[in-house]
């Protein structure tokens, strides 16, 4: 893999990290997304972040959270309001990528969400995230999953 491609992947990974933090903050505070984004950009070194992708993830996940929740509810084993805030933010981001970014293989979406959960979540939350998003991928990307298996 070329250094340029590696840098692009790393920039997207960093965008996801900042986005999940912003989504979490929005869930807890309901502060306007533009304020969360502006403060994040001022307070952090963002020169190696895919800023366009960060902006898209943060704004679109928040704007579409009700629709994303509708996708998630059938594959959850508990009520939405019983989820940990980090888990919910990570699941919403993963659901958005599964639904709206078909160019990203579903396994990459799952792997990235698992890494976010390991970094920000509780001890075993990555296992829960994996299970939920795998079930969602079966619904949203059935053909891709069948082809991969």
Curated annotation (Swiss-Prot):
Top-rank taxon: Bacteria
GO terms under biological process: DNA-templated transcription termination; transcription antitermination
Residue ranges of the TM segments: none
Record's keyword annotation contains Transcription regulation: yes
NCBIfam families linked: nusB
Family as reported in the entry's similarity comment: Belongs to the NusB family.
Protein name: Transcription antitermination protein NusB
Originating species: Acinetobacter baylyi (strain ATCC 33305 / BD413 / ADP1)
């Amino acid at each position: 893999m070329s250094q340029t491609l590696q840098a692009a992947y790393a920039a997207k990974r960093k965008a996801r990290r900042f986005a999940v933090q912003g989504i979490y903050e929005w869930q807890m505070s309901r502060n306007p997304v533009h304020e969360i984004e502006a403060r994040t950009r001022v307070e952090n070194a963002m020169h190696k972040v895919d800023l366009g992708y960060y902006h898209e993830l943060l704004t679109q996940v928040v704007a579409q959270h009700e629709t994303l929740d509708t996708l998630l509810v059938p594959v959850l084993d508990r009520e939405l309001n019983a989820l940990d805030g980090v888990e919910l933010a990570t699941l919403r981001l993963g659901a958005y990528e599964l639904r709206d970014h078909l160019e990203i293989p579903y396994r990459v979406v799952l792997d990235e969400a698992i890494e976010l959960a390991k970094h920000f979540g509780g001890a075993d939350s990555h296992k829960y995230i994996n299970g939920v998003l795998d079930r969602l991928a079966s619904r949203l990307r059935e053909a891709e999953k069948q082809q991969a298996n």
